[in-house]
Regions:
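Glycine-rich, charged/polar anion/phosphate-binding loops
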Residues: 31-33, 51-54
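Structural detector for internal amphipathic alpha-helices that build alpha-solenoid repeat scaffolds
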Residues: 96-114, 132-146, 166-194, 202, ...
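Catalytic core of non-heme Fe(II) oxygenases with the double-stranded beta-helix
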Residues: 1-36
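Amphipathic alpha-helical scaffolding segments comprising HEAT/armadillo-like alpha-solenoid repeats
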Residues: 115-127, 144-171, 193-205, 224-238, ...
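Conserved metal-binding segment of the jelly-roll/cupin
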Residues: 39-52
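Terminal, low-structured helical/coil segments at or just beyond the last alpha-helical repeat
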Residues: 331-352
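Non-heme Fe(II)/2-oxoglutarate
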Residues: 52-124, 133-135, 139-141, 145, ...
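Short helix/loop capping segments that flank catalytic or ligand/cofactor-binding pockets
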Residues: 6-8, 21-22, 48, 55-56, ...
């Protein structure tokens, strides 16, 4: 259907997908300019999952319908997948280390080209600056290379202690408790690049769960270049904190084929008591199950997740099975399809 602004389209705050805070989460008090996602029938809008967004008021006489699809990257980008003419990010009017880092990552490169401000200034901003200053500082420090790692690890430990109570709660930037914003010090470490992997492996035993979880996330973002971390990430699948287990199995899925040696332990996460760990486990196995590869040992547990209480978990289990060239997996998918044909909403009061 054609969607106009008075029909209550989705409203977004452009450029806020890396922001932990905005002026005010109350839409009536928000100072940032929003953008209404309007368009003719058939229009498709691609939106970063973490961008601040909300449903706008429908003041028209029409109902507004929407189809929402969630996309997840299944492998680390080894090279540009578009017509690529420039090596460096040059489209922004001002120096922006965050944009440069994302550009390099999409091009299959790690690290930043150069620091945009002195390290002393960036270190000060990392702890006490404004939201934008802290974000820029993280990626500026990431351009300082490995010499900055010990200092950044110290910042990470302090930041973990400071935000621990808030970050476990449902907050405006993490309304469902499943997608917390990364710590700024962790973003700085990730920007340095995978040459830090050996040093980080020694830090995965840190006594603070948020430090362990953050470093698992960092290693996973480095992709196959951090393949030496398989053993340590596998050990952390038995961690006492759900967030560490979740990030550890997610990281294994991102490391590529080398993580296949951890498949039995990854399969065990499909039985985890926390739905968020099960979700990450199903997605990680789906990432390993490239077309033409069978992970037959995972099939029985994936079949169990097909009836998981969480709809996303069910989807990722379907996805993992669909990526396997295996007759048992195919049969499980067909059985699930026929089961889905039964309507669970039919009652004596609503027969049809």
């Amino acid at each position: 259907q054609d969607t106009t602004e008075d029909m209550g389209p989705t409203g977004i705050l452009p450029g806020t997908h890396n922001w932990e805070h905005i002026s005010d989460p109350d839409a009536s008090q928000t100072a940032e300019d929003d953008l209404s996602l309007c368009g003719k029938a058939g229009t498709v809008t691609l939106l970063h999952f973490d961008a601040w967004h909300r449903a706008m008021a429908n003041t028209s006489t029409h109902k507004r319908y929407m189809l929402k699809f969630q996309f997840a990257r299944m492998q680390w980008p080894p090279q540009p997948t578009w017509q690529h003419e420039r090596d460096d990010w040059q489209l922004s009017q001002s120096a922006n280390p965050v944009e440069s880092h994302v550009w390099n990552w999409l091009c299959g490169r790690t690290g930043l080209n150069s620091a945009s401000e002195p390290a002393e200034t960036a270190l000060s901003n990392l702890g006490t600056g404004s939201e934008r200053a802290r974000l820029d500082a993280a990626y500026t420090l990431g351009a300082q290379e490995k010499d900055m790692l010990p200092t950044l690890l110290g910042h990470l430990r302090r930041e973990a202690r400071e935000v621990e109570k808030r970050i476990e709660n449902k907050t405006p930037d993490n309304a469902h408790g499943t997608n917390p914003t990364a710590l700024r010090a962790a973003q700085a470490i990730e920007a340095i690049g995978p040459d830090c992997t050996p040093a980080l492996l020694e830090e995965l035993n840190d006594p603070h769960w948020l430090v362990r979880a953050s470093l698992c996330d960092v290693i996973g973002l480095w992709g196959p270049a951090a393949g030496d971390a398989v053993s340590q990430l596998t050990t952390l699948l038995g961690d006492t904190h759900w967030w560490v287990r979740r990030n550890a199995v997610e990281g294994l899925g991102r490391l590529g084929d080398v993580a296949g040696q951890a498949l039995p332990e990854m399969v065990n996460t499909l039985k985890d008591k926390d739905r968020r760990v099960r979700r990450a486990g199903a997605l990680a196995i789906a990432q390993l199950a490239q077309q033409g590869k069978s992970l037959s040992n995972a099939i029985p547990s994936l079949m169990t997740v097909l009836s998981d209480e969480d709809r996303y978990n069910r989807f990722y289990a379907h996805l993992a099975l669909s990526r396997m060239e295996d007759e048992t997996a195919k049969a499980a998918l067909i059985d699930a399809l026929f089961t889905a044909r039964w309507c669970p909403l039919t009652t004596n009061e609503d027969l049809y």
